[in-house]
């Protein structure tokens, strides 16, 4: 794995965006890398308390292609550290591999594709390098082998739809071994504001079906972004997921912005200890905030000092788990 580590980052460090184009076909390629210098001040996991080091949360190489005005495709591979603080190990996988075609005001895409759970929200939020969205952290998948259809409902483009089927087949970044049916509608009354309504259904064997309802409302201007996200996932006999999040950015100078995500878990996260980089105690409800100051050092480098702090309610035994507190310096190189 060490050889893979050095090879990947040698490629990324020397990478610059490239493109080849003619009248009928074009291809472009780029990459990005983000990670943290971190110090764990407190943790509900005693072995990680007072640990420190560097973690590579994502290194990505991407190739995009277009043929004519309608066909498009993407191939993307990624490398990332997995494990726990002071015990990380770099691994890699394919993240995207798909082909699509525009059909007037609609588009169909098939392959290993991003789910439609987060695409609109992340486009407006645009801070995934700092922290994943709350439902993504707690188990709603972001990739699936499947097919999606997106398009406009109204002629003025203020109402649009997205439909997707995710198959039970798994490959690379898709780890969900169940069929999934997804739909969403976006209302955009102005260029700056939007409302998204989202649902999905995931049949599973026995009494373990999953169904999700999600609402997002946001507003984005040149000066700030603010958004509210609520997700409820019923898991029948399994513990449910219910989470609310507040997202925000505020530009304070031409090269500095305040950024934050706060979220509250209405129910404990059963697999919280397995969440890489930000583990949660699985026995208690929790409030988490990730907040920092983002400094832009040119078009391709962001430096963001930030804190990630989780506070717990009392669990069913009447015990409040130890807080989780990380101090981080997040670095983001973007060559895409």
Where are these regions (language model features)?
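Interfacial loop-to-helix transition and helix-capping segments at the boundaries
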Residues: 175-178, 208-210
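Outer-membrane beta-barrel pore domains
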Residues: 25, 34, 39-50, 85-90, ...
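Hydrophobic helical h-region of N-terminal Sec-dependent signal peptides
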Residues: 6-10
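Positively charged n-region of N-terminal signal peptides that target proteins for export
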Residues: 1-4
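Conserved adenosyl
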Residues: 172
